[in-house]
Amino acid sequence: VDFVVQRQHTAWDWTKAEQHGKWIESAYLSGIQRNDKALLDKARTMLKRIVDSQEESGYVGATSKDYRSDERPVRGMDAYELYFVFHAFITVYEETGDKASLAAAEKLADYYLKYFGPGKLEFWPSDLRDPENRHKSIDALSQFAGHGVHYSWEGTLLCDPIARLYEVTGKKKYLDWSLWVVGNID
C-alpha cells in the first residue's frame, strides 16, 4: 500500500501497483465468509489508507502526479491496476454498505469519465482500426492507454467495474460510458 499511497511510479510495469486492489477485495470476502475479525480489521486499515490518499480529482493509483497531465491523465498500465481497485471498492460497498468505498469508486469513475469518452481521449487510437491498420507498425507501449498490441482494450477492463457502479448507483452516466466503450470495439 505504501507504493500506491506515495504515488511516485512512472514506469510501464504494473506488478507492484495492481496487488492492493486484489488483496483488499479478497481479504474482505474471506474475512466476511470466515468471520475473521483480525483479517477484516487489517483490510479496513489498508482500505482506509487508500481511500484517504485519493486525490481530489478522484485519481487513486500509483502514478506520480508530475507524470500525469490533461493530455496524459494516466500512465499506460493504470487501467490494469485500477480495475482491481474499482472492484475492491464496489465489493466492499456491496458486502458492508461502506459509503466511503462507494464514494471512492464514484470519484475514480468520474476521473476516467472526465478524460476518456466521446470527443475526449480514447483507449484505442482511431487510425489503428482495420483497414487503416494493415501493414502499419506501431509501438507496443502507450503513454496513457496501456498496450498497443491489443489496441488499447483497457477501456473494456474499466467498463466492467463502471457498469457495476451503474448497477449500484443507478447513475446513467456510468452506463452511457460503458456503452461508449463497447460501441468502440472493432
Whereabouts are the PLM-identified features?
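Glycan-recognition and catalytic cores of secretory/periplasmic carbohydrate-active enzymes
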Residues: 1-186
